[in-house]
Amino acid sequence: MTEQIPAPQPPADENSLIAERRAKLGALRGQGIAYPNDFVREHFAGDLQAEFADADTWTPDALEASGRTVKMAGRLMAKRVMGKASFAQIQDESGRVQLFLQGNVLGDAYTAFKGWDVGDIVAVEGGLTRTKTGELSVKASALRLLTKSLRPLPDKWHGLSDVEQRYRQRYVDLIVTPEAREVFIKRSKIIRAMRAWLDARRFLEVETPMMHYIPGGATAKPFTTHHNALDLDLYLRVAPELYLKRLVVGGLERVYEINRNFRNEGVSTRHNPEFTMLELYEAYATYHEIMDLTEQVIRDTAQSVLGTTQVSWDGADIDLAPAFRRWRMDEAVRHHNPEISAADCTDRDALLRHCERLKIRVKPSYGWGKLLLEIFEATVEHTLVQPTFITDHPVEVSPLARSSDTEPGYTDRFELFINGKELANGFSELNDPEDQAARFQAQVQAKDGGDDEAMHFDADYIRALEYGMPPTGGLGIGIDRLVMLLTGSTSIRDVLLFPYMRPEA
C-alpha cells in the first residue's frame, strides 16, 4: 500500500480568510457575474515595460500625448487603497505592471475594487502614465474582476518557503516565485533550441511507442500496465532505442525523439521515475562523431539560451567552450586508483580484491566489466567536474554497443559527465544480429540470476537487424539534467513542473 503523507492543514486565520472570500464569491454569484469569460486581452506587462523603459523619453506628458491605450489582464499581486485614488499591481506571464485607479473615473468599479483581494484575477483598460517615482503605470478607465481567488497567497516577504509544498503546489510556486517561472521558461527554450539545432542538420523528429510488449533499450526496471481489451501485459518504455534503430533499418538515417521515459527506480535529487530524454541515431557515424555532436549541441544550446557557455552548477564553475576531455574508463580508474594495474582491469579476481579493499558491495554474478564499472562509479565519477567523456566501456555493461575492433571485451561507447553527474550516453551501435542475439541471451541469464534491470530477448529487433542496419552512432541526453546544468538547479525536482511525490492523505 502506498504510504500517504497528511495534507498540511491551513491555520485558523487562513480558514477565516477563505470563508470571507467565499462570502464575497457568493455575493458575486448573486449578481450573476461570478466568473465572466468575455474579456479579450491585447497587451502584456513585459512588452509595455520594455517598450516604455526609457523614462527620460517617455515622461508622463509624452505618454499622455502618445494616446496609447492598453487592454490587459492579470493576477492582483498588491493593492494600496488611499481614499479617492489607489494603486495596484497585476502580474501576467510576462511580468508586472502598476495600475493607477481613481474613484471619480471608475465609479462603482472603484468601490468594488476596495473589496477585492490579492490573488484575484482582474482586467483593466486605460492609458499610460508614469508616477513621481518613475514607475510606468496604467491609468485605468475601466476595471473588472474576472476570477475570484478563494485561497490567500503566501506572504510576499517569505514566499512559499516549504520546499515540499513548492513541489506539491507548483501552481502557487509559479505565482509567487519568479525564479521558478524563469527555470521553466528556460527549459522550454532549451528544448526548442535543441530541436532547431537537429532540424537544421537534417534530423527527422519521430514518435515511437510509449507502451512496449518487451521492455528494452536500457538496463532498468520497467513499470508494468495492462491492456484490458487485449488482455495483454505491457511495459511503459524505459527507452525508445530499439524502435528508433528499427527506423534506421527502414531507411530513416537521421532520427531523434524528445519524450518521456519511465523507470521503476528510486527517487533522488538526480532521479525521477519519469524523465525526459533526447535520443538520436545517425547512420554512417561512429561514436567519435557522436561525441563531437554531443559537445556541439550542448555548447550551442547554452549559447543560444543563456548567451554564454559559462555556467555555475552546484558550487562548480563549468566552462562549456573548451573541447571536452576524452578519457578511457580503465585509464580513469587506474589514475584514481594507482594500486590497480592495466592487467587488473580485465582480471575478475583482481578486481574483486580491489572492490573488497574499497568496501564496494558486489554480487557474485558480476564479471570483470561490471566490477570495473563499480570501481569507476565509486572512485572516479564524482571527481569529473569539467565536461568529460568517459569512453570504451566493457561489453558486459554495454549490451547494445558495438564491440571495439582493437580492444577485446570493450565497446565503442561513451558517457558524458559534468560536475560528477552523467548527462549523456552514446555509442557506435551494435548492428551484428548474431552478436546482439548472444548479448540478449546473456542479459536473459542475468535476469534469471536475479538482475531485475537486465534486458529481455527482443526477437523482432533481431529480425530487424537481420535485414541490415548501416553503421550507426546513437546518443541519449538527459534533458532534465541538462536543464539543471543550464539553470544552476541542484535538484531534478526544481526542473520538473510536477515531480513525483508521495500522495497526501
UniProtKB/Swiss-Prot annotation:
Query: What are the entry keywords?
Result: Aminoacyl-tRNA synthetase, ATP-binding, Cytoplasm, Ligase, Magnesium, Metal-binding, Nucleotide-binding, Protein biosynthesis
Q: Which CDD domains does the annotation name?
A: LysRS_core (cd00775), LysRS_N (cd04322)
In which residues is Mg(2+) 2 bound? E422
What's the top EC group for this one?
A: ligase
- The protein's predominant localisation is cytoplasm
Q: Which GO terms describe its biological process?
A: lysyl-tRNA aminoacylation
> Which annotated residues bind Mg(2+) 1?
E415, E422
The UniProt entry's GO CC annotations, sorted and at most eight, read: cytosol
Q: Which PROSITE patterns match?
A: AA_TRNA_LIGASE_II
Q: What does the UniProt cofactor note say?
A: Binds 3 Mg(2+) ions per subunit.
List its EC numbers: 6.1.1.6
Give the matching SUPFAM superfamilies.
Class II aaRS and biotin synthetases, Nucleic acid-binding proteins
* A Pfam family assignment: tRNA-synt_2
Q: Which cofactor does it need?
A: Mg(2+)
Q: Which domain of life is it from?
A: Bacteria
Where does the protein end up?
Answer: Cytoplasm
- Reactions accelerated catalytically: tRNA(Lys) + L-lysine + ATP = L-lysyl-tRNA(Lys) + AMP + diphosphate
The entry's family comment says: Belongs to the class-II aminoacyl-tRNA synthetase family.
Quaternary structure, per UniProt, is: Homodimer.
Q: What is this protein called?
A: Lysine--tRNA ligase
Q: Which organism is it from?
A: Xanthomonas oryzae pv. oryzae (strain MAFF 311018)
Mind giving the lineage of the organism this protein is from? Bacteria, Pseudomonadati, Pseudomonadota, Gammaproteobacteria, Lysobacterales
